[in-house]
Amino acid sequence: MAIKVAINGFGRIGRLAFRRIQDVEGLEVVAVNDLTDDDMLAHLLKYDTMQGRFTGEVEVIEGGFRVNGKEIKSFDEPDAGKLPWGDLDIDVVLECTGFYTDKEKAQAHIDAGAKKVLISAPAKGDVKTIVFNTNHDTLDGSETVVSGASCTTNSLAPVAKVLSDEFGLVEGFMTTIHAYTGDQNTQDAPHRKGDKRRARAAAENIIPNSTGAAKAIGKVIPEIDGKLDGGAQRVPVATGSLTELTVVLDKQDVTVDQVNSAMKQASDESFGYTEDEIVSSDIVGMTYGSLFDATQTRVMTVGDRQLVKVAAWYDNEMSYTAQLVRTLAHLAELSK
């Protein structure tokens, strides 16, 4: 029997998750909830500037959509607690609105009858933060609300874990060179949150910004909690980002080849490895949560310490979405 999924919030991540789930056996989206009208949602599902056209058939019908012959109910309910998740026997809600980002708020989906909630954002408070294939084995099935972290944390975590496990990570700094997103202005204008830099034209500027990924990594890999800090530079590309991580290692005399070899050995469906001289457009649509770029590894001895700089690519849309769907499937499987 298929795992029944509802998507709350049919924006960039919600729609791409819908697409991704179509290719995953055993998962079925049965409902979406978004305040936008169905005709617009169907259009944006079918056509996507960065990820390309959806290959399936999409039709608006009364009360929802028909996608590849399957009916999907659509709601425009602003209060998650009033959604009919119990009547629809929803196994997992993929929470993509950005509003239900702590356990107390996400509990509204549980109260409405859903069995589990996966938040597509960093969560506040006592919520397990999962990066699939880094710490998903910490889930035991008892959790009702789980966070899928952020796209940047998903790119950072496997790299940081390898450095910590193999060479000892003392401390470090990360920078994400990040595509612009919907929380930036396309023309110079007052920003809704009063941010003077995000008020500037996203496609024309390199815009310094903050990131919580360095702090959040401690929720994923407790042994490096507090050892990293970081920032972001938003750049004029619509998707396709890069995380640079520079750390002091505990182990001495580490070489570039040793670092790259350790990363290659750790590669899996979530963590890719490449020695090709790629650029950001090459990784758009990629389903690795993080793609280690061996061509950018550098090492330096500073006093009696070893300094290493590494880099990993990620599609801040599809890479993250693929990781979310992996976590969603695992979370639901544990509940069977």
From Swiss-Prot:
<feature type="active site" description="Nucleophile">
    <location>
        <position position="151"/>
    </location>
</feature>
<comment type="pathway">
    <text>Carbohydrate degradation; glycolysis; pyruvate from D-glyceraldehyde 3-phosphate: step 1/5.</text>
</comment>
<feature type="binding site">
    <location>
        <position position="198"/>
    </location>
    <ligand>
        <name>D-glyceraldehyde 3-phosphate</name>
    </ligand>
</feature>
<keyword id="KW-0963">Cytoplasm</keyword>
<dbReference type="InterPro" id="IPR020830">
    <property type="entry name" value="GlycerAld_3-P_DH_AS"/>
</dbReference>
<dbReference type="InterPro" id="IPR020828">
    <property type="entry name" value="GlycerAld_3-P_DH_NAD(P)-bd"/>
</dbReference>
<feature type="binding site">
    <location>
        <position position="234"/>
    </location>
    <ligand>
        <name>D-glyceraldehyde 3-phosphate</name>
    </ligand>
</feature>
<feature type="binding site">
    <location>
        <position position="120"/>
    </location>
    <ligand>
        <name>NAD(+)</name>
    </ligand>
</feature>
<dbReference type="GO" id="GO:0050661">
    <property type="term" value="F:NADP binding"/>
</dbReference>
<feature type="binding site">
    <location>
        <position position="316"/>
    </location>
    <ligand>
        <name>NAD(+)</name>
    </ligand>
</feature>
<keyword id="KW-0547">Nucleotide-binding</keyword>
<comment type="subunit">
    <text>Homotetramer.</text>
</comment>
<feature type="site" description="Activates thiol group during catalysis">
    <location>
        <position position="178"/>
    </location>
</feature>
<dbReference type="GO" id="GO:0006096">
    <property type="term" value="P:glycolytic process"/>
</dbReference>
<feature type="binding site">
    <location>
        <position position="181"/>
    </location>
    <ligand>
        <name>D-glyceraldehyde 3-phosphate</name>
    </ligand>
</feature>
<dbReference type="Pfam" id="PF00044">
    <property type="entry name" value="Gp_dh_N"/>
</dbReference>
<feature type="binding site">
    <location>
        <position position="34"/>
    </location>
    <ligand>
        <name>NAD(+)</name>
    </ligand>
</feature>
<feature type="binding site">
    <location>
        <begin position="12"/>
        <end position="13"/>
    </location>
    <ligand>
        <name>NAD(+)</name>
    </ligand>
</feature>
<protein>
    <recommendedName>
        <fullName>Glyceraldehyde-3-phosphate dehydrogenase 1</fullName>
        <ecNumber>1.2.1.12</ecNumber>
    </recommendedName>
</protein>
<dbReference type="GO" id="GO:0004365">
    <property type="term" value="F:glyceraldehyde-3-phosphate dehydrogenase (NAD+) (phosphorylating) activity"/>
</dbReference>
<dbReference type="InterPro" id="IPR036291">
    <property type="entry name" value="NAD(P)-bd_dom_sf"/>
</dbReference>
<comment type="function">
    <text>Catalyzes the oxidative phosphorylation of glyceraldehyde 3-phosphate (G3P) to 1,3-bisphosphoglycerate (BPG) using the cofactor NAD. The first reaction step involves the formation of a hemiacetal intermediate between G3P and a cysteine residue, and this hemiacetal intermediate is then oxidized to a thioester, with concomitant reduction of NAD to NADH. The reduced NADH is then exchanged with the second NAD, and the thioester is attacked by a nucleophilic inorganic phosphate to produce BPG.</text>
</comment>
<keyword id="KW-0560">Oxidoreductase</keyword>
<dbReference type="InterPro" id="IPR020829">
    <property type="entry name" value="GlycerAld_3-P_DH_cat"/>
</dbReference>
<keyword id="KW-0324">Glycolysis</keyword>
<comment type="similarity">
    <text>Belongs to the glyceraldehyde-3-phosphate dehydrogenase family.</text>
</comment>
<feature type="binding site">
    <location>
        <begin position="211"/>
        <end position="212"/>
    </location>
    <ligand>
        <name>D-glyceraldehyde 3-phosphate</name>
    </ligand>
</feature>
<dbReference type="Pfam" id="PF02800">
    <property type="entry name" value="Gp_dh_C"/>
</dbReference>
<dbReference type="InterPro" id="IPR006424">
    <property type="entry name" value="Glyceraldehyde-3-P_DH_1"/>
</dbReference>
<dbReference type="InterPro" id="IPR020831">
    <property type="entry name" value="GlycerAld/Erythrose_P_DH"/>
</dbReference>
<dbReference type="GO" id="GO:0051287">
    <property type="term" value="F:NAD binding"/>
</dbReference>
<keyword id="KW-0520">NAD</keyword>
<dbReference type="GO" id="GO:0005737">
    <property type="term" value="C:cytoplasm"/>
</dbReference>
<feature type="binding site">
    <location>
        <begin position="150"/>
        <end position="152"/>
    </location>
    <ligand>
        <name>D-glyceraldehyde 3-phosphate</name>
    </ligand>
</feature>
<dbReference type="GO" id="GO:0006006">
    <property type="term" value="P:glucose metabolic process"/>
</dbReference>
